[in-house]
Swiss-Prot record:
SUPFAM superfamilies: Cell division protein MinE topological specificity domain. Belongs to the MinE family. Keywords: Cell cycle, Cell division. InterPro entries: MinE, MinE_sf. This is Cell division topological specificity factor. The keyword Cell division applies. GO terms for biological process: cell division; regulation of division septum assembly. Prevents the cell division inhibition by proteins MinC and MinD at internal division sites while permitting inhibition at polar sites. This ensures cell division at the proper site by restricting the formation of a division septum at the midpoint of the long axis of the cell. HAMAP family: MinE. It comes from Pseudomonas fluorescens (strain SBW25). It comes from the Bacteria.
Amino acid sequence: MKFLDFFRANKKPSTASVAKERLQIIVAHERGQRSTPDYLPALQKELVEVIRKYVNIGNDDVHVALENDGSCSILELNITLPDR
């Protein structure tokens, strides 16, 4: 009987293999969207604390971004300072 099963075209994949494939797709998608490192929010918080020692700013006045350009990583820091 197994010999005849080889020629059948209506083979359905098992539910476990389908679930595994879907999970791999979801994990790969989430990894692609999580391009920012885990330390970036903590870095932004510490930068705000240091800048507050000298200038009165809010939490939303500091923006930190990390760009990966091939073999080079660029850390971009934008600070909105209040008018004097």
